[in-house]
Design a protein with these regions (language model features):
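N-terminal helix initiation/capping motif
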Residues: 1-2
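Compact, glycine-rich, soluble single-domain proteins
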Residues: 5-93
Length: 93
């Protein structure tokens, strides 16, 4: 299965970086889900939860206070104003 290259950053630097099979985020007009092969997109984020699921099923979650998400050629960049880890290392179904 194709993977996404994901970078989650805030004003202090990189929060998380690596390969993932799925990213979901709270876009201003509703939840957005990203899989490999997604069309290029730039989206404003609102307060909510960013979720990254690695290929092995490990789930990383952060509550974010807004920012933006960019997707281009399986590269996902999430830039947030602030982020707080919710849980890490749980398994996706």
């Amino acid at each position: 299965m194709a993977q996404l290259e994901v970078d989650l950053v805030d004003t202090d630097g990189t929060i998380w970086s690596g390969e993932a099979r799925q990213v979901s985020a709270p876009a201003s007009d509703g939840e957005i889900g990203i899989l490999a092969g997604h069309t290029p997109v730039l989206s404003v984020l609102r307060h909510g939860e960013v979720r990254v699921i690695e290929a092995g099923g490990t789930v990383h979650r952060w509550t974010v206070e807004g920012g933006f998400l960019s997707v281009d050629a399986d590269q996902v960049t999430v830039v947030v104003d602030a982020a707080e880890a919710v849980a890490s290392g749980t398994s996706a179904r």
